């Protein structure tokens, strides 16, 4: 069995890829460059995780048109990545408009071309409270798109094992799977030493605190 795993190099996607391997899949790692601030570090970490899993393939896809589209502090450097405490409610400014539809479209092409059985994406409970393209309803709808838009015998299943879990629960799974979290990166703002205050750093640090383990990456 083969699975395409969307692998950003972050905590969730790395745990996800390790879980897919544990589930018996050979890994086809798929990484995206879309002009995000921390792309250099993300790519480095994604490659390390792919090597850790003996991935069959590591495919990097350039989606820098999403940077040209703009409207996200991840890709528009004129916008500041806000501290978690300053972010407020509603859709965060780190939301990249309709990003997951773009990523999953490429993942579906890759999966169909390689004869993969599944696509793994690491959406989780704290994501869909703010990101509309992480909602379970969106994932269900995209499964229909995959089924209707691929060959009748493709049978590609979109898997979201973390969709009802919080970050601490995901981290517990990862610890059982011996995920090398020192080779992952979550910070939205920095490439060398994590800022510790952006939304992504906040939720990662909180997850480690909740299970009583020291996060192995450096913070300011």
Swiss-Prot record:
Belongs to the QueC family. One of its GO terms (molecular function) is ligase activity, forming carbon-nitrogen bonds. Catalyzes the ATP-dependent conversion of 7-carboxy-7-deazaguanine (CDG) to 7-cyano-7-deazaguanine (preQ(0)). The lineage of its organism: Archaea, Methanobacteriati, Methanobacteriota, Stenosarchaea group, Methanomicrobia. This is 7-cyano-7-deazaguanine synthase. ATP binds at residues 7-17. Its EC number is 6.3.4.20. It is an enzyme of class 6 (ligase).
